[in-house]
Regions:
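Conserved class I S-adenosyl-L-methionine
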Residues: 1-39, 48
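A short acidic, Gly/Pro-enriched loop at the edge of an enzyme's catalytic core
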Residues: 87-97
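Class I SAM-dependent methyltransferase SAM/SAH-binding core
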Residues: 42-85
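SAM-dependent methyltransferase
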Residues: 133-206
Length: 242
């Protein structure tokens, strides 16, 4: 799916950081840190992270995404790499690892997620920072963005938002993730892609098992929306503690 030219084009056209990302990056990433950017996609996070890092490496399991990044930033280091196997990197190599835009949720089973967390912990230096995001299993409604529309377009955007929210909620309830606070669904937004969903309460033991402590949790619509049922995903800033 992520080698599809249309998908690659969509990711290449995504620009800038979300306010929640900007907040966590500014707070936890220091000038001249060595940064590994996992699931780099079309390079949305590359301008910010590469500018602040002493060494920046972007990786993605889609070769087409990696090629798109090479075209955009030929001077930077981009590699085709699976997040569950970072064996090309030595232990304690990076100060910071970033896995943005819920990329970790594309790993299709719990054992794969555990390998990913373990590999990230391995390549981080002692006290290193891991910033990632994960879909909210208890999302009730995806609030539409209405700042750029007028008239009937407002109605259609609200209607579309309700339609997609209902689709996701039905799948979350059907699969048990809403009640359990974690689980897998087949996402209607991205063509039936299998995605993991979680809550801050269910993420905490998962990252703890890999040797991380959560320092801060921020909702994806921060600072304007803080209600849990209206938060599509959460960002987590974690520190390697063992």
């Amino acid at each position: 799916m992520f080698n599809d030219p249309a998908i690659v084009s969509r990711f290449r056209n995504a620009k800038g950081l979300e306010p929640c990302e900007q907040h966590l990056f500014q707070k936890f990433i220091k000038q001249d840190d060595d940064v590994l950017d996992i699931g780099v996609g079309g390079g949305r996070t590359t301008p910010y992270l590469s500018a602040i890092a002493r060494r920046y490496v972007g990786v993605d399991y889609s070769q087409a995404m990696v090629e798109a990044c090479h075209e955009g930033w030929p001077e930077l280091d981009f590699r085709n790499c699976d997040a569950t196997d970072l064996s090309e990197f030595s232990d304690t190599t990076f100060d910071v690892v970033v896995f943005s835009f819920n990329g970790i949720d594309n790993i299709g089973d719990d054992s794969g997620r555990a390998r990913c967390f373990a590999e990230i912990a391995r390549v981080l230096k002692p006290g290193g920072v891991f910033i990632f995001s994960s879909h909210n299993a208890r999302l009730l409604w995806i609030l539409p963005v209405l700042d750029d529309v007028r008239g009937l377009k407002i109605f259609w955007r609200i209607a579309y938002s309700i339609f997609k929210s209902v689709q996701i909620l039905i799948r979350t309830l059907w699969g048990g993730a809403f009640l359990a606070g974690r689980g897998y669904i087949f996402d209607p937004v991205d063509g039936g892609l299998k995605l993991f969903q979680s809550t801050p309460e269910t993420i905490a033991p998962e990252v703890s098992a890999a040797g991380f402590a959560i320092m801060e949790t921020v909702g994806s619509r921060w600072p304007s929306v803080k209600a849990r049922l209206l938060t599509p995903w959460y960002y987590y800033a974690c520190q390697k503690c063992r």
